[in-house]
Amino acid sequence: MYPTWVEARPFMLGSAGGTAEVWRCGIGAVECAARTAGVLAARRPDFILLAGIAGAHPSVGLAKGDTVMVSREYAADVGTLREGRFIPLPVDGNDVKNNFYDNPTSVPPLFRSVASDTVAVAGTPVRAESAACIENMEGAGFFAVCGALGVPFAELRCISNYIGEERGRWRIAEAVGRLAEDVGRFIDAVREWS
């Protein structure tokens, strides 16, 4: 599953492209959650992968073109603004804030495992503090649906930019090319792992 056909196309045209079904989930957590739920209900896959590009925090040691496995997603921009400050909403009335979702699925350790912030606006300063190394726009919705329905899943992201960097400096073409190669490697490894 890919957010856009731009991200999916290199995989679909590559040598591994015929080895898996490919769906587009759309951009944003809500669109991704809705389309993921639809695919899971209609197709009932044994395993589902979300793959796309992401922005990295400049200080975490990731380079553009690095692919990472997301092990935790934070719904980082769910909260309120008070006096110019972002306040994450508490979960179920307790002190836990900044809803997060962990991936319990065991997968081959091919890539560095990181936490990610899911945000509606790339580079937004309106977010909760977290231990995330990267940001994307879909992951929390994907994690929530797959977790709720008990479907094994994984999320791969290839770094196209640094958070806050102007879009002209992003390396989207290089990132989606690398992502296609790494998705193929990951699919092969999952099949051997199973």
Question: Residue spans of the language-model regions?
Answer:
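Glycine-rich phosphate- or other oxyanion-binding loops that anchor nucleotides, phosphorylated ligands
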Residues: A8-S194
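Gly/serine-rich nucleotide phosphate-binding loop at the start of the catalytic core
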Residues: M1-E7
